[in-house]
Amino acid sequence: MTMGGTEKNVENKQYRLPREVKEALQAIASEWEDVIDSKALQVIPLKGAMTNEVFQIKWPTREKGPSRKVLVRIYGEGVEIFFDREDEIRTFEFMSKHGHGPLLLGRFGNGRIEEFLHARTLSACDLRDPEISGRIATRMKEFHGLEMPGAKKALLWDRLRNWLTACKRLASPEEAKSFRLDVMEMEINMLEKSLFDNDENIGFCHNDLQYGNIMMDEETKAITIIDYEYSCYNPVAYDIANHFCEMAADYHTETPHIMDYSKYPGVEERQRFLKTYMSYSDEKPSDTMVKKLLEDVEKYTLASHLIWGLWGIISEHVNEIDFDYMEYARQRFEQYWLTKPRLLAASEHK
């Protein structure tokens, strides 16, 4: 899970970038005539990242003009368990070429340099704003319609099984028992059987659409979806379900790992989002169509809880970022077991 950041109020001298990163940054800045000194860069760490270290880099310009800015992303340790970095970079480049994200300005051994988008990273409360939520719905529909290279095959179930294998390898016997990892393969099989539908809509999904991965231009109100580490083809109902689950999160509090499921969107809010989503580029959806998608989305929240629960366990063992991954995992699994009986009642005999 990656996050768009907010600036920390710190002295930049506390944060030293590797030499190869500085050299790459200086090479980029030397191409800009308005930069006074390519070596006079300011490093501002961005708060909230849980997979990578992210920094805003600024240079002063002549005649007191606006600073030149770029974004540096240093990849987190152990993330190759979650996704293939080369696949993610290819997705990033594809998105850039098709106007769906920042430009790739440079690469170095364990990271890259991106265009700094002059837009605001959304906050948790923005997701509840009807106007902003509607814009997210339409942008999401566009995203799902992207024709990406490769087979149009859902990867959700393979990813769940692969992450479960990693969990079993990394977790202590006590952790495995606490999280009931011994029954998880059976749960994944049951979910796939209950949720899979030959007629379901498969699209290119972000799979991590929380507020920190959404930016909005304050003037045009245009929405940009960023950070594609987990992006792949999947049921679109799953991607929407995951977005709804993220409304229970606020990663910029003193307890960023705590989820508040009282903030999960109500039926009317979910229906409004889905109607906007389905209306974009299509005819007005019937009530029956909206109801069907709503039911599918609700069931796919179970897959969201499982996958991010597994992610939390793995991250505890491979990631050094200051975040209570185990408590986060516990909450996601708890929500899975709590909601499963109600959500699968109608399909348990499928």
Swiss-Prot record:
Keywords: ATP-binding, Kinase, Lipid biosynthesis, Lipid metabolism, Nucleotide-binding, Phospholipid biosynthesis, Phospholipid metabolism, Transferase
Swiss-Prot/TrEMBL catalytic activity: choline + ATP = phosphocholine + ADP + H(+)
The UniProt record lists the keyword Nucleotide-binding: yes
Pathway(s): Phospholipid metabolism; phosphatidylcholine biosynthesis; phosphocholine from choline: step 1/1
Enzyme class per UniProt: transferase
Positions with a binding annotation for ATP: 73, 210, 227
Inducing factors: By wounding, and salt and osmotic stresses.
GO MF assignments: ATP binding; choline kinase activity
Cystine pairings recorded for this chain: none
EC number: 2.7.1.32
Family annotation (Gene3D superfamilies): 3.90.1200.10, Phosphorylase Kinase, domain 1 (3.30.200.20)
The keyword Phosphoprotein is annotated on this UniProt entry: no
Pfam families the record matches: Choline_kinase (PF01633)
The protein's role, per its UniProt record: Involved in phospholipid biosynthesis. Catalyzes the first step in phosphatidylcholine biosynthesis.
Family according to the record: Belongs to the choline/ethanolamine kinase family.
PANTHER family assigned to the protein according to its UniProt record, in alphabetical order: CHOLINE KINASE 2-RELATED, CHOLINE/ETHANOALAMINE KINASE
Stated name of the protein: Probable choline kinase 2
